[in-house]
Amino acid sequence: HEAMIIREERIGNQRLLLGDCREIIGGLTFDAIVTDPPYGLGKRMQGGTWGAKDHNSGFLKWDLSAPDWLPEAIGQTPAIVWGGNYLPFPPSRCWLMWNKVNAVPTMADFEQAWTNLDRPSKRMDLPVGRVEYGHPTQKPLALMEWCLGFLPDAKTILDPFMGSGTTLVACQRMGRH
């Protein structure tokens, strides 16, 4: 699987792999998955709404179903998947909810993460960050640290999508890999 890795970087104690996650994932070992898959690919934000006149135009196939390899990659591995309520995962006993206490009125008041954890659902009240990092759906660092708190025995965390790197920063701050 190393041939599928385009580039490898070290950031602190973290290992960042550049490549197609669908090809790389089979050769990796990890204790848990914490991720926020991309969604709304091909859509443009227009005044706080998603293409208000033609709501369904512009969505790519990615948005219509879970990546076929993701449920298999999860298997029995503890997992937290943001946006999982939009994907056809099995029923969950434990949903994590981020209550955006200062959400923009035209956007969602909260976000949900699907988990395969055997515990009651939980909610975190946390303001939406006002810092612009160039990523349209960046999760707050405190939110990702909260997620890692549900996985105390997981030392190696997989985030196959990376996004703005918030999971990586949370892992670094919490002594995870």
Predicted regions: what they are:
Residues 1-158, 162-177:
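Class I S-adenosyl-L-methionine-dependent methyltransferase catalytic core
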